[in-house]
């Protein structure tokens, strides 16, 4: 018992003598803003399918080449009166190449139009992604970045217009589903 008390006292004394390092030359600032509610996406554009169609893999001449432009829009309503402009951000999995393009996926079942083997195996196209552009100036809208800002009218409505296109992300594009 005496041994435990002496050991505990020695440990306590060691901790009291231990040096402490404090940094006094740095400052952390937290900044932010509490905003009004957001605009609402209209029901006719909240869940939409943008058909890019069937495109030959030979339509792509190299990395960055584009095919099959398709226009689509996202309409907003009930925007707060304090807002004068709106933008959207698209999210998803980025295509290989890291240029802000959306990766294409694999169909869920072999009955989907991705089964080009006849074996019941679902196949996704490779070497291709989906690139989104602002229709107003044809600038790219990269994943997780704001689109071009669109004016909100006096009724609290706005329509943001875009173009989606397939983009070659690799020199070799293979056939398959490109959803």
Kindly label every feature range from the protein language model.
Residues 2-8, 19-179:
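Mature extracellular/passenger domains of Gram-negative fimbrial/pilin and adhesin proteins
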Residues 14-17:
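Short, Gly/Pro- and small/polar-rich lid/capping loops
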